[in-house]
Amino acid sequence: MAVKWTEEQEKVITLRDRNILVSAAAGSGKTAVLVQRILSKIMDSVKPVDIDRLLIMTFTRAAAGEMRERIERALDQALAEDPDNEHLQRQMTLIHTAQITTIDGFCSYVIRNYFHLIGLDPGYRTADEGELKLLQEDVLKELFEDYYAEGDEDFTTFVECYAAGKSDESLKEHVLDLYDASMSNPWPEEWLDGCVENYCLDPEKGIVETKWYQSLWEIVDSALKEAEELNRSAMEICGESEGPELYLDALQKDLVLIRQLQELSDKQDYDQMVQTLQNLSFARLSTKKMEGVSGQLKSLVKDIREDAKDILKDLGSRYFQCSLEELTELTLASAGPLKMLVKLTKDFAQRFSDKKREKNVLDFSDMEHFALEILLKKEGDICTPSQAARELSEKYDEVLLDEYQDSNLVQEILMQNVSGWVNDRKNIFMVG
């Protein structure tokens, strides 16, 4: 029995020649829609596409394997109904070598085909987790021993202030955490430098001129817009025929609060924002008996309202716990330790990279960054697609990514540079 798609799903399946991001809740059939889109392109009666002209990426081998099986089953069924169809016969052959893969699998493909462009030994292997963990531990141990032996005053102060008791294990964990965070960025060393820059205050301008402070208000604006959208959604439900109309009073008061916060954000009034968020007070929903009201809609409104309230509470707990003066003092006090942490992290990254080169092994992060180095030419702040990127871009009719919400910036740039974006075509399809 054929699947009956909704109007929205049908649109997503059939739209062509544009970049598309499908955002929907878990369990809503996003992956099924992606598979159907692939099938619709392969079986298009007017302009069918060979499956090896599609780059299909997801985040686990299991998911990639399941997707390949789904496509193969559908092709098998179509071929059973039309056994003389040469195009379908060809797809059944191509399915086994089609690029239905994980992101790291695609990176490996790029490196295998273009390793000579970055001077990489083609005899490399991918290290397993256990081996990498032991290697990291050895490098960290050697790193800290060297710093202790040098007697660096800044390092000694850093350890005395931030180590837990007599153990420096927590500091080693901080180095690893910062290293991992940096490696999810296209240019890790630049990102680490930016972390330090955020804490280097100009005495005359103070914290308000830092990139971090300006970015903070962008985060606040986005969060408040989301809270406002949730509030409006809840009010719309209250206005339905079986909606809890008596909840509107509390929701309208919530909206007044959100708009008050938006005004403070527009003025970048940090201290008043602290005062408001640290003293949040929400009106109680009406407890009066409501005739003819859907219990399901009441629960839905309550849940949506709680989500909006959580956004406001989260802003207060994350970003607005002290005055601007105190924040400035904390930032200045944190600058020295952060510089040392970044220095340790950079040193660790270099030593870890050297050890992996010695053993001729790569980890998944290496593969992403080597693939990026192959696909992107960077000169100063200007990045342009390489010849390899242009070749791969011509190879793919469409680039499809499942579970887009799990991708990082490195992976997004990789996807962009093998897509039609390189030559002004729109052919990226993402679900998440």
Segments the model singles out, each with a brief description of its role:
Residues 4-8, 13-14, 19-23, 50, ...:
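Conserved helicase NTPase motor core
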Residues 31, 51, 92-99, 117-187, ...:
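ATP-hydrolysis module of ASCE/P-loop NTPase motor domains
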Residues 33-49, 419-420:
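Walker A/P-loop NTP-binding motif
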Residues 53, 172-362:
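Conserved ATP-driven helicase/translocase motor core recognized via long
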Residues 54-71, 103-107:
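Conserved Walker A/P-loop ATP-binding site and its immediately adjacent core
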Residues 64-96, 117:
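Conserved helix-turn-beta segment of the N-terminal RecA-like "Helicase ATP-binding" lobe
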Residues 86-108, 360-370:
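Inter-Walker segment of RecA-like/P-loop motor cores
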